[in-house]
């Protein structure tokens, strides 16, 4: 039996392998085996490591300072969109416009669902575009782009309560810490080209998709032509939907330009450079309902090769064929697409080395969704009226569906336009890259216009969620994280100086719940365990705790304490993503008006001065006034100003700050990154905020600088006087005594806590910020861990709040301006697929807006949007 026959029979388990040979050229056995090896690796990878996806349904489309953000999480497997049985823990994070995580929830996944909320009351607060992202730790194995991310405008609290026509955001956010890469405005007109398959091939016709956008990323309609050196037209093009379109072009060695006329002005753009050798790869997904029409063509400079074509969808291999391409003519064939699942499929053309020569994304099928009927008991409602809503859910066959609904009812007045749904996210947005203006439009109809526009979208914004080089075994894949089964803690014991792993040492852990330290013997509030590190010095444990717990870890070897360091694997959150300019726009429902944020100001650079000379000049000025003594008596005065309440002063100071740090958490984070700061507060500040740095005077005195000027430290909101004892008092504080730190650049705040003998001019010349240190009460200061001991904390599952529903059977005296009238993340339908809710209106809504989403156990999606 020949090897080829053996392959045909042996890999019949795949059920879809077939060979295409142009002009009956045979396929060598050695090449067939190599191509099949990549496909086998691809299939096994998909089975062994299926991916997960996350979708969040939110209660509203925008928020104001002080609002609650409510959300329902759906965690599914990518293959069938069914509730995941893998990961049991979901991380949901709220990031401010600068990319700082201001709140985080750790939620237990049960039957693929969990729920939570954030409160927009953190300090310091500044309005802008906030990001909510969600992921399982297991998802991070496949890249940060797999993380669910949604951007919301968060507006300043309106001047008049309930005036939601006022949509103001911070116009100068650059003064706040910026961890997010800055969004930059583009040219007036931008034209980008995307050859089908990935590249232009010399002397071969290639379909080229393109996208035209303005400076803010908005799609624009243009028409134009391709001009050669002689300015002759070799091809023409025109946008079809949302600034996108496709034209066919044969590239050669000549330099060509694309010319368009927009707003009565001509613009010229360069096309991608053509490859001297290669294969053009074209996929027609529109002409034949049940097949993919594929065309492969090489040019005369490209040697004949045996190639493979793989068809994947949702992380699973669905089809594979081999073909020999020897002649410089197009070769076309068809692949059946009836067995492909609804959604995005990826076709890959690859060679015997496993290298991708070309690939293409296509959308196959029509979503088979649930039917959701929603009815209100009245057409119009009065203030504080009782609102009744009925729901009925049926499967695609018309049978009642018993499922859990996430339901949001809102006062839709001046509502920001919603652009997403579970359907668009799970089937489309999670498979492509970049911003899509209105993804729901592509699912409004199954006609030629919508199908062609969706095909062009995938040619322009195609992103490979499933990395070929890893799946096919071309490059090794590192599995960093297994699906978590609870609150997992992983760590490593290393030597103090050289950070060498310490195997076979004992790690003792002691957990006590925050606030329950006085009951260490209570099994519900404390836990004790002992582990032994493996050959790499690693250890781990799993728990199901809720809330925040104190954790003490100690290291011993043969019964003796060892001065080793314990590093915990808790720094795994993704980097904040860069916003596109198109995302930073607000569309009001039913209105095309767009609000744009102001461009961020560039950071100001300040000149440094010799601080010792400045202080000396200041002291000399005091002596001239006869104030060289430490204590001075003044005549009796009458103070007429009203004294500011201390609590009010503290709150006001916090609101004007630009950054907040929980010092214990920050120190833990530094240690988890295998860093060391000892008791140096300057080192702590530098680690927490990159704007801080050290400067040394000629006399060797160390100063901390911030954005070009010195830093003023104030402890517990008390003034800092310019004398040796008071000015350096902050450096004597043990870091364990510091509860939190606020940074303020507000000039009034700096003056409030600076030495009152300084003039405002001197203060402005001297200080750039004030670091406000808040300390623990003396009896609450933690004792520093001893030899081989690490005192830290364990974050358990977050405590979930319930949405508040007011009872207006007795009318209230005050107005009610709630924007979210009703939120239920888990409303259950009965056996007839029906459910009913009743709640009270606010003081002005007439026509509530309703959004309902659901996902059944077999992966059927249901969406209702009003």
Can you annotate each of these PLM segments?
Residues 30-52, 57, 63-64, 68-108, ...:
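Contiguous segments within soluble domain cores/interaction surfaces
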Residues 128-134, 256, 345-347, 549:
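A short tyrosine-centered beta-strand micro-motif
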Residues 45-49, 60, 64, 85, ...:
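Surface-exposed, low-complexity/disordered segments
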Residues 116-120:
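Ligand-binding face of N-terminal immunoglobulin V-set domains in extracellular IgSF glycoproteins
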Residues 72-73, 130-138, 348, 851-855:
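Internal, hydrophobic beta-strand segments that form the core of beta-sheet-rich folds
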Residues 1-37:
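Bacterial Sec-dependent N-terminal signal peptides
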Residues 229-230, 712-721:
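Short strand-turn-strand beta-turns centered on an Asx-Gly dipeptide
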Residues 106-109, 235-241, 321-327, 529-534, ...:
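Short beta-strand segments within Ig-like beta-sandwich modules, predominantly Fibronectin type-III
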């Amino acid at each position: 039996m020949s090897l080829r026959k053996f392959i045909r029979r042996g890999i019949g388990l795949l059920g879809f392998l077939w060979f295409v040979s142009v002009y009956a050229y045979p396929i060598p056995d050695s090449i067939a085996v190599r191509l099949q090896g990549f496909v086998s690796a691809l299939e096994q990878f998909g089975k062994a490591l299926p991916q997960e996806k996350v979708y969040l349904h939110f209660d509203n489309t925008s928020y104001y300072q002080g609002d609650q953000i409510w959300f329902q999480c759906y965690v599914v497997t990518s293959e069938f969109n069914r509730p995941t049985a893998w990961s049991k823990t979901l991380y949901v994070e709220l990031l401010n416009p600068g990319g700082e995580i201001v709140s985080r929830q750790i939620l237990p996944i049960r039957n693929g669902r969990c729920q939570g909320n954030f409160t927009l009351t953190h300090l310091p607060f500044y309005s802008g575009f906030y990001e909510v992202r969600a992921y399982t730790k297991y998802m991070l194995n496949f890249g940060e782009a797999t993380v669910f991310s949604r951007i919301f405008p968060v507006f300043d609290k309106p001047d008049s309560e309930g005036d939601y026509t006022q949509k103001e955001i911070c116009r100068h956010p650059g003064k706040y810490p910026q961890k997010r890469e800055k969004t930059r405005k583009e040219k007036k007109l931008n034209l980008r080209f995307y050859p089908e398959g990935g590249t232009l091939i010399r002397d071969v016709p290639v379909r080229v998709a393109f996208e035209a956008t303005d400076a803010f990323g908005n799609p624009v309609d243009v028409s134009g032509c391709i001009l050669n050196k002689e300015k002759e037209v070799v091809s023409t093009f025109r946008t079809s939907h949302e600034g996108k379109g496709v034209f066919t072009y044969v590239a050669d060695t000549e330099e060509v330009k694309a010319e368009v006329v927009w707003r009565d002005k001509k613009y010229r753009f360069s096309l991608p450079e053509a490859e001297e050798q290669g294969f053009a790869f074209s996929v027609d997904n529109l002409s034949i309902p049940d097949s993919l029409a594929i065309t492969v063509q090489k040019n005369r400079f490209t040697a004949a090769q045996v190639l493979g074509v793989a068809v994947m969808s949702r992380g699973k291999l669905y089809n594979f064929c081999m073909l020999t391409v020897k002649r410089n003519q197009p070769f076309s064939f068809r692949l059946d697409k009836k067995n492909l699942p609804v959604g995005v499929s990826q076709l890959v053309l690859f060679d015997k080395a496993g290298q991708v020569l070309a690939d293409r994304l296509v959308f196959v099928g029509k979503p088979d969704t649930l039917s959701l009927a929603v009815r209100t008991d009245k057409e119009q409602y009065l203030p504080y009226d009782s609102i009744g809503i009925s729901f009925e859910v049926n499967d695609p066959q018309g049978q009642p569906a018993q499922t859990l609904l996430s339901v949001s009812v809102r006062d839709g007045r001046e509502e920001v336009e919603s652009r997403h749904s579970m359907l668009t996210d799970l089937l489309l947005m999670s498979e492509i890259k970049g911003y899509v203006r209105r993804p729901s439009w592509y699912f409004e109809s199954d006609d030629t216009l919508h199908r062609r526009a969706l095909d062009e979208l995938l040619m322009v914004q195609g992103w490979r969620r499933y990395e070929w080089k890893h799946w096919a075994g071309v490059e090794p894949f590192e599995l960093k994280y297994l699906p978590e089964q609870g609150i997992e803690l992983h760590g490593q014991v290393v030597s103090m100086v050289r950070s060498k792993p310490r195997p076979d040492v004992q790690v003792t852990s002691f957990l006590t719940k925050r606030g329950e330290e006085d009951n260490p013997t209570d099994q519900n509030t404390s836990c004790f365990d002992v582990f032994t590190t493996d050959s790499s010095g690693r250890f781990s444990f799993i728990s199901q705790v809720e809330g925040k717990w104190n954790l003490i870890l100690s290291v011993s070897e043969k019964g003796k304490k060892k001065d080793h360091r314990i590093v915990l694997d808790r720094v795994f959150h993704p980097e904040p993503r860069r916003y596109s300019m198109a995302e930073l726009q607000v569309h009001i429902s039913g209105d095309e008006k767009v609000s744009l944020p102001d461009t961020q100001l560039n950071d100001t650079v300040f000149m440094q001065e010799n601080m010792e000379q400045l202080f000396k000049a200041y002291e000399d000025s005091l002596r001239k006034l006869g104030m060289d003594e430490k204590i001075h008596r003044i005549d009796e005065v009458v103070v007429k100003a009203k004294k500011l309440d201390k609590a009010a002063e503290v709150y006001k100071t916090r609101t004007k700050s630009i950054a907040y740090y929980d010092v214990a958490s920050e120190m833990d984070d530094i240690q988890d990154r295998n860093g060391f700061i000892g008791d140096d507060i300057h080192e702590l500040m530098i680690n927490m905020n990159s704007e801080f740095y050290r400067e040394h005077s000629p006399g060797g005195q160390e100063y901390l600088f911030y954005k070009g000027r010195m830093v003023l430290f104030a402890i517990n909101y008390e003034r800092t006087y310019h004398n040796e004892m008071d000015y350096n008092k902050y450096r004597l504080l043990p870091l364990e005594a510091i509860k939190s730190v606020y940074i303020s650049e507000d000039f009034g705040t700096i003056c409030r806590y600076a030495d009152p003998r300084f003039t405002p001019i001197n203060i402005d010349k001297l200080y750039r910020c004030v670091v406000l240190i808040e300390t623990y009460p003396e009896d609450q200061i933690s004792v520093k861990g001893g030899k081989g001991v690490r005192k830290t904390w364990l974050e358990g599952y977050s405590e979930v709040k319930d949405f508040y529903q007011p009872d207006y059977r007795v009318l209230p005296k005050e107005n009610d301006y709630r924007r979210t009238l009703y939120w239920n993340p888990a409303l259950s339908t009965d056996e007839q697929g029906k459910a009913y809710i009743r709640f009270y209106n606010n003081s002005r809504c007439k026509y509530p807006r309703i959004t309902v989403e659901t996902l059944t156990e077999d992966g059927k999606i249901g969406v209702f949007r009003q």
